[in-house]
From Swiss-Prot:
NDH-1 is composed of 14 different subunits. Subunits NuoA, H, J, K, L, M, N constitute the membrane sector of the complex. This is NADH-quinone oxidoreductase subunit K 1. It comes from Solibacter usitatus (strain Ellin6076). It is found in: Cell inner membrane. Its EC number is 7.1.1.-. It comes from the Bacteria. Keywords: Cell inner membrane, Cell membrane, Membrane, NAD, Quinone, Translocase, Transmembrane, Transmembrane helix, Transport, Ubiquinone. GO terms for biological process: ATP synthesis coupled electron transport. InterPro entries: NADH_UbQ_OxRdtase_chain4L/K, NUOK/Mnh_C1-like. PANTHER family: NADH DEHYDROGENASE SUBUNIT 4L-RELATED, NADH-UBIQUINONE OXIDOREDUCTASE SUBUNIT ND4L.
Length: 103
């Protein structure tokens, strides 16, 4: 199936997804949006790993992507727990309001 679509298209899609993630990380002020942007960047890198792995007929990229997804799932659980705790304590998810150390 991937032989019908050039490899450059997958890498271009990966670059676009990564750029959207960076833009969301840099320009958004909501913690959940920033968190989702980081996850989008991770998935863009995973797409690149799988693309190169398929092109070179090796399994290493697929295995590495699997482990990255496992770690990302654990990171998502911990990150959402932290976000929930911050929201309970501060009643806001704006990064500028959460950054201040005073209560």
């Amino acid at each position: 199936m991937m032989n019908a679509v050039p490899i450059s298209w997958f890498l271009t899609l990966s670059a676009i997804l990564f750029a959207l993630g960076v833009a969301g990380f840099l320009f958004r002020r909501n913690i959940i949006t920033v968190f989702m942007s980081i996850e989008l960047m991770l998935n863009a890198v995973n797409l690149s790993f799988v693309t190169f792995s398929y092109q070179h007929k090796e399994v290493a990229g697929h295995l590495f992507t699997f482990f990255v997804m496992v770690v990302a799932a654990a990171e998502a659980a911990v990150g959402l727990a932290i976000i929930l705790t911050v929201f309970k304590n501060r009643s806001t998810l704006n990064i500028d309001d959460v950054n201040s150390m005073k209560n």
